[in-house]
């Protein structure tokens, strides 16, 4: 249960980081 929430949080952070990278590449 706890590790599932942790994975969810990590996935969210990774998703946001990926979105930021894509936005940076597109904006460059």
From Swiss-Prot:
Keywords for the protein's UniProt record, in alphabetical order: Amphibian defense peptide, Antibiotic, Antimicrobial, Cytolysis, Hemolysis, Secreted
Tissue-wise expression: Expressed by the skin glands.
Subcellular location: Secreted
GO biological process terms held by the UniProt record: defense response to bacterium; killing of cells of another organism
GO cellular component, as recorded: extracellular region
Pfam family, one: DD_K
Highest taxon of source: Eukaryota
Similarity section: Belongs to the frog skin active peptide (FSAP) family. Dermaseptin subfamily.
Record function comment: Antimicrobial peptide, active against the Gram-positive bacterium S.aureus, and the Gram-negative bacteria E.coli and P.aeruginosa. Has hemolytic activity at 612 uM.
The protein's name in its UniProt record: Dermaseptin-6
Species for this entry: Phyllomedusa tarsius
Lineage: Eukaryota, Metazoa, Chordata, Craniata, Vertebrata
């Amino acid at each position: 249960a706890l590790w599932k929430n942790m994975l969810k949080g990590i996935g969210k952070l990774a998703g946001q980081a990926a979105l930021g990278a894509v936005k940076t590449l597109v904006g460059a």
